[in-house]
């Protein structure tokens, strides 16, 4: 017999399946139903799915419900409409903590001796007054039964992804389209740590709400026609993208009424608010030419205007051109020579940066000085008002030949890529008051040969 941490007497001996017996058998169920209908002019499909998961960790579960719709209809000989949308709702109770969190169940369980039955902790994790029973003197390994029975967290997420398209055919070879897309979700998370928890003896509660929305509007005009031996296709279009992220976090310290899970039940409440916005306007196009199914030429262009760059640098243009020649079509068919193609391409690609890298960012401290709010610089990085877009230039030539009915072949490529004005956050001396600085860095080049 041995005395355990609360002076109870228990039998001494090795405990079989000591850690395994703490966990439950995980169960996941999925149910789905779908409806669809089609006729000569229209088609649609609606589906509903529901997933429930009861985790191996006691008191932890997840549920997710999704509803999807997809349909199209031909309103006239020239006009067609398509739409699709998916809505999902997810609810999670008590996500298990990970890594070095004090409430990580694994950290506490792996530290239990083989002769100490973890079930002894289940009836002694708190005393008769509701206070935590300190079983090991380690605030980083909290009693796992206190974690699952007294501490709690929950989250809910709503997400809507939708897209609608209009197609209009002016002629058989000239068509226009308009597309609008939306991706929006709200994530709400609450984390409750009761009074007397090691490391949080006064209690703590955190509520977080994240709202994210991104939408795109795009218009395109397409042309495709054959002129004698030439195949011609082209399109030109424009796109507008807007992104917005908003976060609100409230943290309550020092609980007033023990056990009451409400953010107003704390004597100290800190609020953090963040708002990030980005917009990109684009114009793009492509022309493709084909001659007698052996010579091809493609040219593209794109011009982006990004809100994350300074007015003089926010518009950047990047084109490309590529061509190929299937020279095997120039000769009479040979049994030993199956296929041969030469190809070459050149392209430029541009890129912007994340929002708010051009100027200092400011925030307010949660406390005041004689009733006056205190402001501060929130970023630890030196901004750069003259950031340029990153540019990557690539060049490639190659040959693909095959013999003996594709039994033998050689694919050879030479490539070169040069990246200029990379946008980097580099470390600087902290004596400057900052830890990093935003810069456009020099030039990086790589080239090589590939053969297979």
Regions from the language model: what does each represent?
Residues 16-26:
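Periplasmic N-terminal accessory/gating domains of Gram-negative outer-membrane beta-barrel systems
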Residues 22-23, 30-52, 56, 68-74, ...:
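Predominantly transmembrane beta-strands of Gram-negative outer membrane beta-barrel pores used
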Residues 28-30, 62-68, 282, 316-320:
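Transmembrane beta-barrel architecture of outer membranes
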Residues 33-37, 69-73, 162-168, 219-223, ...:
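Residues on the lipid-exposed face of transmembrane beta-strands in outer-membrane beta-barrel proteins
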Residues 37-39, 50, 73, 166-168, ...:
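Residue-level signature of outer-membrane beta-barrel architecture
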Residues 256, 278, 286-293:
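Active-site-adjacent "gating/activation" loops or surface patches in catalytic cores
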Residues 311-315:
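Short glycine/threonine-rich loop-to-helix capping motif typified by GTGT followed
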């Amino acid at each position: 017999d041995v005395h355990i941490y609360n002076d109870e007497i228990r039998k001494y001996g090795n405990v079989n399946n000591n850690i395994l017996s703490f966990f439950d058998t995980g169960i996941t169920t999925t149910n789905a139903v779908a409806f669809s209908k089609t006729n000569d002019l229209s088609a649609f499909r609606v589906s509903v799915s529901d997933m429930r998961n009861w985790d191996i960790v006691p008191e932890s579960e997840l549920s997710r419900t999704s509803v999807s719709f997809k349909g199209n209809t031909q309103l006239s000989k020239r006009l067609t409409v398509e739409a699709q949308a998916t809505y999902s709702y997810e609810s999670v109770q008590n996500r298990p903590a990970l890594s070095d969190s004090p409430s990580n169940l694994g950290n506490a369980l792996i530290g239990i001796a083989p002769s100490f039955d973890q079930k002894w902790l289940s009836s002694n994790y708190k005393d008769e007054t509701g206070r935590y029973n300190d079983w090991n003197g380690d605030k980083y390994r909290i009693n796992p039964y206190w974690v699952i029975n007294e501490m709690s967290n929950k989250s809910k997420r709503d997400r809507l992804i939708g897209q609608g398209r209009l197609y209009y055919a002016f002629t058989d070879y000239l068509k226009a389209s308009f597309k609008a897309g939306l991706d929006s979700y709200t994530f709400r998370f609450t984390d409750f740590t009761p009074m007397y928890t090691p490391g949080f003896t006064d209690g703590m509660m955190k509520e977080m709400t994240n709202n994210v929305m991104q939408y795109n509007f795009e218009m395109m005009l397409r042309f495709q026609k054959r002129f004698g031996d030439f195949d011609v296709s082209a399109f030109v279009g424009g796109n507008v993208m807007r992104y917005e992220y908003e976060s609100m976090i409230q943290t309550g310290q020092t609980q007033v009424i023990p056990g009451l899970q409400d953010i107003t039940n704390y004597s100290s409440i800190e609020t953090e608010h963040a708002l990030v916005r980005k917009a990109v306007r684009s114009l793009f196009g492509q022309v493709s030419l084909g001659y007698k199914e052996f010579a091809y030429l493609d040219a593209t262009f794109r011009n982006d205007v990004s809100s994350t760059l300074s007015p003089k640098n926010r518009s950047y243009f990047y084109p490309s051109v590529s061509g190929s020649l299937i020279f095997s079509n120039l000769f009479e068919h040979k049994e030993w020579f199956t296929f041969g193609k030469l190809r070459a391409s050149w392209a430029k690609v541009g890129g912007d940066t994340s929002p708010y890298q051009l100027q200092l960012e400011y925030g307010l401290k949660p406390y005041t000085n004689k009733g006056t709010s205190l402001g501060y610089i929130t970023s630890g990085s030196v901004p750069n008002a003259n950031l340029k877009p990153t540019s990557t230039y690539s060049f490639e030539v190659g040959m693909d030949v095959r013999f003996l009915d594709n039994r033998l072949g050689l694919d050879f490529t030479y490539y070169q890529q040069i990246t200029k004005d990379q946008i980097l956050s580099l470390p600087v001396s902290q004596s400057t008051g900052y830890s990093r600085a935003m810069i456009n860095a020099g030039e990086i080049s790589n080239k090589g040969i590939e053969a297979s």
